[in-house]
Amino acid sequence: MNLNRWLFSTNHKDIGTLYLIFGAWAGMIGTALSLLIRTELNQPGNLLGSDQTYNVIVTAHAFVMIFFMVMPVMIGGFGNWLVPLMIGAPDMAFPRLNNMSFWLLPPSLLLMLASSAIEAGAGTGWTVYPPLASNLAHAGASVDLAIFSLHLAGASSILGAINFITTVINMKTPNMSFLDMPLFVWSVLITAILLLLSLPVLAAGITMLLTDRNLNTTFFDPSGGGDPILYQHLFWFFGHPEVYILILPGFGIISHIVAYYSTKKEPFGYIGMVWAMTSIGFLGFIVWAHHMFTVGMNVNTRAYFTSATMIIAIPTGVKVFNWLATIHGGLIKWEAPMLWAFGFIFLFTVGGLTGIVLANSSLDIVLHDTYYVVAHFHYVLSMGAVFAIMAGFTHWFTLFTGYPLHSTWTKIHFTTMFIGVNLTFFPQHFLGLAGMPRRYSDYPDAYTLWNSISSMGSMISLTAVVMMTFIIWEAMSSKRSTTTTEQMSTNVEWTYLCPPPNHTHVEATHLIRP
């Protein structure tokens, strides 16, 4: 294996593969951290020995899963691999920038892990709120390293976003209009626009935090005329679009899979799906303060953010019903990717419903910073984003490698994972309603039952993660041959061979409508 091929690659397929491998490793680190959290919370009493250590693990778990697992896999992995193939482009618009976007991530991950390893670690939560993140409450270099890590990961994402936007706008095959693009390409385009608009705001916020910590500025320090609430506004103006960045590519993946395994040529309501994603992207920018209902906003502001947040349920509902309409009347092929897609639709909807509950500012005053919120966002992330990743991975693995995954093992894996994540996160709704707060390593005895059930679920999920590594090994070592792909006319990525040649196009492409 040529080292130069992987270090200096300008090939979208190789870089996509690097992203997928990196994301898989980061996912295992993130899973290990989550198991430490659940082991600590299995029973009352201390296991890790200090709340600071516990919060360092929680913070690292969040950052690793968001910035080094979900984003690299969905946007970097699936995006790089599939977008050029789906629009008939020979590669990405800026191939070397593409390589740099990837290679900014390993140093970023290293800095993030270093921030946990030195001093007492960055135990701030993934929101990094001052004054807890100030140089008084967090002396030492931990938070500074975490900030630098975020700068690198953010730079990587911004460069990647520029690359995707340019590629999609300029490199489509000549007679392909925007409304001819597959939904996954649309989802990546909208995600890239969200990244480009939101990440600079995060960069500004954490840079001000960095200067507050090291250069005696007082952006977030009331004693010098600053305001810690300003940081919250800056963070969540990034943070809310970020959660849509995490789920939008998943919407695109699920749209493809649902159509494919229902034996349909295309998803139901294509234009509606495009507008729904666009609306979600737009609305995602004007609801950020629903994360801040407890900081003391006046009633008009709370009424606006409650209403605006609930409006997002409309385009989301459009998407869910369009997926169901796509399945309706189709000849369903019950293969693993379709099981993941069904799981996604059901569990993402459950997560969305708890989101509607939390959108009510009056209810959120009570539920804010309880396990109800943890349950909500893990339903949309651990069972939304991750299920979409698994659906995409089991569907396109053959395209990426040329080898099909084992049909039975992948279904067993889905079942194990489905039971594991639901057992982990469903009880957390009850804990939240009973008032158990987030980010504490210990709790009163009354919460023991649901916590121990939740921790048991996390062990089942671990079994599923281990099973996944076995399934990949089994496929790579068995080297089964591939069968022909159906619906070739509307699933362009399969038209090139499995796996496709290193350089897809030797001449200009042309779109022929079926």
Swiss-Prot record:
GO function terms (MF aspect): cytochrome-c oxidase activity; heme binding; metal ion binding
PANTHER family reported in the protein's UniProt record: CYTOCHROME C OXIDASE SUBUNIT 1
Binding residue positions for O2: 244
Organism in which the protein naturally occurs: Pelomedusa subrufa
Topology versus the membrane: Multi-pass membrane protein
Binding-site residues, Fe(II)-heme a: 61, 378
Binding site for Cu cation: 240, 290-291
Binding site for Na(+): 40, 45, 441
Pathway: Energy metabolism; oxidative phosphorylation
Top-rank taxon: Eukaryota
Gene name linked to the record: MT-CO1
Protein name: Cytochrome c oxidase subunit 1
Endoplasmic reticulum found in the keyword field: no
Gene3D superfamilies: Cytochrome c oxidase-like, subunit I domain
Mitochondrial matrix side: 1-11, 87-94, 171-182, 262-269, 328-335, 401-406, 479-514
